[in-house]
Amino acid sequence: MEDEPAVRWNHNIHYHRHILDVVPDGARTALDVGTGDGLLAMELREFVPQVTGIDPDAQVLKSARRQQSDVTWLEGDVMTYPLTPASFDVVASVATIHHLPDLEATLTRLAELTAPGGTIAVIGLARSSRLLDHAYDIGGFIQHQRLARRFGVWEHSAPTAPPPHSYTDVRRSAARVLPGATWRRLPLWRYALVWTKPTR
């Protein structure tokens, strides 16, 4: 059995800090959607007392359960699992939304699960469709080479899929479903989406 690297790094882990930085003060509950190996959920647990990770893949959840017992691990589809609406102060997702078939229905579901005053924080993948997107891709390639040489690339066990939506599609859908959301293109082929649910 191979030893785990001293520092786990890949494109998704690189942006966990973007999620942790927007956890609301006093947050008590968090949901990690598409938790996979559970790395983000375990980091959230350092800031939030009650963390739930949900994923439809039983195999990747086995790895998560082995590493952390102080998180509630659920096997299921976030779109249909009977989670209590408006019950999470943080709803986070990294590299998951593009796996789900209906982007706007997914964003609506995440908003439904978010408590008033709570935050949705997404790091997602999308397709490049504009010149500016391709410029980010070039910058991301250079950054990847530098960071991969420094840390190596940790391969997660969760399945992967190409993103069906463009960055423009995601930005427009977020504006429709989550008014006031902030959207930002990131290097390393990712975007960040953050939204705070109104309190009334």
Where are the model-predicted features located?
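Class I SAM-dependent methyltransferase SAM/SAH-binding core
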Residues: 37-80
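Short catalytic micro-motifs in class I SAM-dependent methyltransferases
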Residues: 95-96
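A conserved beta-strand element that flanks and buttresses the S-adenosyl-L-methionine
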Residues: 92
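Conserved alpha-helix/loop element of class I SAM-dependent methyltransferases that forms part
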Residues: 10-28
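A short glycine-rich, Lys/Arg-flanked "PGG" loop and its adjoining helix->strand segment in the class I
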Residues: 105-116
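Conserved class I S-adenosyl-L-methionine
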Residues: 28-36
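C-terminal alpha-helical "lid/dimerization" subdomain adjacent to the S-adenosyl-L-methionine
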Residues: 125-173, 183
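Conserved beta-strand signature within the Rossmann-like core of class I S-adenosyl-L-methionine
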Residues: 117-124
